[in-house]
Amino acid sequence: VCIIIFTIAADLFNIQVKNNEYYAAQNNTESKYVVELEAARGEIVDRNGNSLVTNRQGNSIILNAAFFPSQKDNKRRNEIIYNLINLFEKNKEEYAQNLPLKITKSGKVKYSGKKEDIATMKNADMLNLQPYATAQNCFDAMIEKYEIEGYDAQTALKIGNIRYELTRLLFSYENPVTIADDVSDETVAMI
């Protein structure tokens, strides 16, 4: 009992007297996050009041982690992304496609894009592959990481592309990710 009391007293002395400044500084830390918003630009007119540049309404599709399945639920995430991709393609909308991989007509996976983008894809934060990994190695690692088994190669690449974009842009509660810009009102209504 005396040993336990002595140990507790020593810890209290260490926290309250010896390392007081360190623990006080840790107690006073603040956490904050920044959300960037694009401001609307006003109309630009000439000296006579004639419009040179006007505003128009545009829609963006933004994924927000608060309303998206958790990282553990890859199957549900993939289903949502698959449905969004089908909707975008049906309505001929463009969406984020930054994955530096493509599938050729013969079905082979090839690199596409800049060397820096390919190196980023292979790094430890993304697919965690060695620099000498082939395009097929990257594709297979993407399928495994995002659990995209069960889809054909072309569809898996499209889903993997959006999942890669979410990872690349650090998708989280504080950081929503835009996957499509300037989409039609019809597409927004369908979502």
Question: Over which residues does each language-model region extend?
Answer:
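Membrane-proximal periplasmic segments of bacterial cell-envelope enzymes
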Residues: 1-191
